[in-house]
């Protein structure tokens, strides 16, 4: 049976802490990877630290969102990082941008999976309307997932509440679910959170 994939969010700039996290989470019982966002990537020697990780599955969560040429150039600028398994871009950047990112990523490293972020888990239906959206989060996610599929991305990032909906649209794509919390955990600035069990039951390919 295929092991369920869990990415541990390394949302810190403390490299010693991350080393301890990696050491203490090594196990054959679970399929563990490590997610590095812009906080760590832009920190002093963050990129260098990531480049030196060996035999670890690295999820580079840069959430790129710009014009096609700029995003493509940004991907090309990290071509020296040969250990990246997953890379994120915002689907709101549009079809042309997604297509450009996919093309360049496969050119520099065929193993990279490009994931399209739909709606951040920090948004609720009420808060997303405050920035100009008129449709529900599920409707927005559905539309953006369809664009990501058209651009031939490898996967989608969405909250656990949209997974079942996207399984019907993107049945052969990876579906990565962030905003994972255990019952009773503080949710911080997150709005759409879910337990690991419920996310996997809904059909998530991996959780963060």
Regions found by a protein language model. Give the residues of each.
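Conserved anion-binding
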Residues: 2-4, 70-155, 159-164, 169-172, ...
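Hydrophobic faces of well-ordered beta-strands that scaffold small-molecule active sites
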Residues: 5-10, 32-36, 58-62, 85-89, ...
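Short, acidic/polar
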Residues: 13-25, 68-78, 137-147, 190-198
């Amino acid at each position: 049976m295929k092991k369920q994939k869990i990415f541990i969010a390394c949302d810190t700039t403390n490299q010693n802490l991350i080393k301890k996290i990696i050491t203490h989470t090594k196990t054959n019982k679970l399929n563990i990877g490590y997610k590095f966002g812009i906080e760590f990537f832009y920190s002093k020697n963050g990129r260098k630290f990531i480049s030196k990780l060996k035999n670890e599955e690295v999820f580079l969560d840069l959430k790129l969102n710009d014009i096609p040429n700029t995003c493509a150039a940004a991907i090309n600028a990290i071509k020296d990082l040969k250990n990246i398994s997953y890379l994120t871009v915002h689907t709101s950047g549009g079809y042309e941008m997604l297509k450009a990112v996919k093309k360049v990523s496969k050119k520099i490293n065929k193993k990279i999976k490009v994931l399209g972020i739909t709606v951040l888990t920090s948004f609720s239906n009420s808060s997303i309307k405050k920035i100009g959206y008129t449709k529900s989060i599920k409707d927005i996610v559905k539309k953006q997932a369809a664009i990501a599929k058209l651009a031939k991305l490898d996967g989608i990032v969405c909250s656990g509440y949209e997974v079942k909906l996207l399984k019907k649209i993107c049945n052969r794509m990876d579906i990565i679910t962030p905003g994972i919390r255990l019952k009773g955990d503080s949710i911080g600035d997150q709005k759409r959170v879910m337990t690991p069990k419920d996310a996997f039951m809904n059909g998530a390919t991996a959780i963060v």
